[in-house]
Curated annotation (Swiss-Prot):
Keywords in alphabetical order: Cytoplasm, Protein biosynthesis, Pyridoxal phosphate, Selenium, Transferase
Encoding gene per record: selA
Keyword Protein biosynthesis: yes
Family per similarity comment: Belongs to the SelA family.
Role this protein plays: Converts seryl-tRNA(Sec) to selenocysteinyl-tRNA(Sec) required for selenoprotein biosynthesis.
The species this protein was found in: Glaesserella parasuis serovar 5 (strain SH0165) (Haemophilus parasuis)
Cofactors that this protein relies on: pyridoxal 5'-phosphate
GO molecular function: L-seryl-tRNA(Sec) selenium transferase activity
GO CC aspect terms: cytoplasm
Cell compartment(s), UniProt: Cytoplasm
Protein name: L-seryl-tRNA(Sec) selenium transferase
């Protein structure tokens, strides 16, 4: 065994080789030495456990190949682009919505330059970082003011902490939602230091339930849009307008959390209906929150619009600084909102709405091309077909609503062959992410962006 240990080269020796010099030139001395030490330690452990040399230590060539691979891996970003063929357009685990070209350009410019983030150029003095997006949101929603934080859960937390700390918040039992990652509305309330008061039942809540729960310690009435589930059958709920009237009677504000929400009428785009921000503001609700990276089609952000007196208090709360957005997000969000000033162009310019509104004829053409490209790469074990599919918006928006779509399905006599193919797809430069159902792999073409890049990759592999 001692002879095996003596086969491990010293780092000084590696440093003096031409291959070592090349790697140092490319990656730097510190990175080279650090990886060489790790490799040597792994070689020692392998010899100790197996009484043999590891494969990478068989020759000097294999050793430097391993070192090169490890150093290159250090420089590679692990969060690589993937092709989303799951049929879920706003897939939370795959990053949700894609930014428009204008939003990308605005964000990139902000990365490369100083910007007037909190500076009024005309007045030559300090301004507020939410100013530009607030002006746009006022114009688009009819609200008096707006506030932006880094996600919608943060928006809810900020509203609760500002107005309900040490007090009670009344909410329907049927609206105590849980979003992704076991993150629940009651948990957010607990973090904000307020007491949850549940009223009604899971399927039925009446205005009198809210009225009977109001007392001197009530902070506000809360309405939460159940975006990621739906209760059907014998149901009853209270509208924002009814809650506003009740709130005015007792001088209590009403806050609404829309989750996804939209600035345009989804039904006008032949899509399932989703709450529209303008309508919620018009209902008289004091504050409404929604997400920037869902149906809006922009960066992750929690957007709050409503009465100026309440927005001003949110802006002054210490949590606002903790939860605020940076110049990159605000630039991307501003560019996204500007698309809504030109509603006739939304489906052409916002990738999310473009994917959701593709015609079946367009999807048929894509599915046929994808099938041809895949058939050139797969062997006799796999059967490829084009089949009707049902896509979803995703990210908790309209979970029971399906959107007609098409998919290339792949089946095999052995499930192990499909699992092998799934692993193969994940090794591609841009991994292909599909879904499994009915013992088939489904590649739904509605949810995939950069379709031409996908076809090019398959043809060039």
């Amino acid at each position: 065994m001692q002879s095996l240990f003596r086969s491990i080269p010293a780092i000084d020796k590696l440093l003096k080789t031409s291959q070592g010099a090349d790697l140092i030139q490319q990656f730097g001395h510190q990175a080279f030495v650090a990886q060489a030490r790790l490799l040597i330690e792994q070689a020692r452990q392998h010899i100790q456990q197996h009484q043999s040399l590891p494969d990478f230590l068989q020759t000097e060539h294999t050793l430097f190949n391993e070192l090169t691979h490890r150093l290159q891996s250090l420089a590679q970003v692990k969060m690589k682009p993937v092709f989303n063929l799951t049929g879920i357009v706003l897939h939370t685990n795959l990053g949700r919505g894609l930014w428009s070209e204008q939003a990308i350009s605005a964000a990139t410019s902000a990365m490369r330059n100083n910007v007037a983030l909190e500076f009024d150029i005309e007045a030559g003095k300090r301004s507020h970082r939410d100013l530009y997006v607030s002006e746009l949101l006022q114009q688009l929603t009819g609200a008096e003011a707006a506030c932006v934080v880094n996600n919608n859960a943060a928006a809810v937390l900020l509203m609760l902490a500002t107005f309900a700390q040490g007090k009670e918040v009344i909410i329907s039992r049927g609206e105590l939602i849980e979003i992704g990652g076991a993150f629940r509305i009651p948990d957010i309330m607990a973090q904000a230091g307020c007491k949850l008061v549940e009223v009604g039942t899971t399927n039925r809540t009446h205005l009198k339930d809210y009225r009977n729960a109001i007392n001197e310690n009530t902070a506000f009435l809360m309405k939460v849009h159940t975006s990621n589930y739906q209760i059907q059958g014998f149901t009853s709920s209270v509208s924002e307008e009814e809650l506003v009237a009740l709130g005015q009677e007792f001088n209590l504000p009403v806050i609404s959390d829309l989750g996804s929400g939209s600035l345009t009428d989804m039904q006008a785009l032949n899509l399932p209906a989703e709450p529209i921000m303008q309508q919620k503001v018009a209902s008289g609700v004091d504050l409404v929150s929604f997400s920037g990276d869902k149906l809006l089609g922009g960066p992750q952000a929690g957007i709050i619009v409503g009465k100026k007196a309440f927005i001003d208090q949110l802006q002054q709360h210490p949590l606002k600084r903790v939860l605020r957005c940076d110049k990159v997000i605000l630039s991307g969000l501003e560019a996204t909102l500007r698309h809504y000033l030109f509603p006739d162009r939304l489906t052409d310019e916002l990738p999310t709405l473009h994917l959701l509104t593709q015609s079946l004829d367009c999807l048929q053409h894509k599915a046929e091309r994808l099938k041809v490209a895949l058939s050139k790469r797969l062997d006799y074990r796999y059967l490829l077909q084009i089949e009707p599919s049902e896509a979803q918006i995703g990210s908790g928006a309209l979970p029971t609503e399906k959107i007609p779509s098409l998919a290339v399905t792949i089946s095999a006599d052995k499930q192990s062959d499909l699992l092998e193919l799934e692993k193969q797809f994940k090794t591609y430069p841009n991994p292909i992410i599909a879904r499994f159902a009915q013992q088939k792999m489904w590649l739904d073409v509605r949810s995939v962006a950069e379709f031409e890049v996908l076809i090019f990759m398959l043809e060039e592999l």
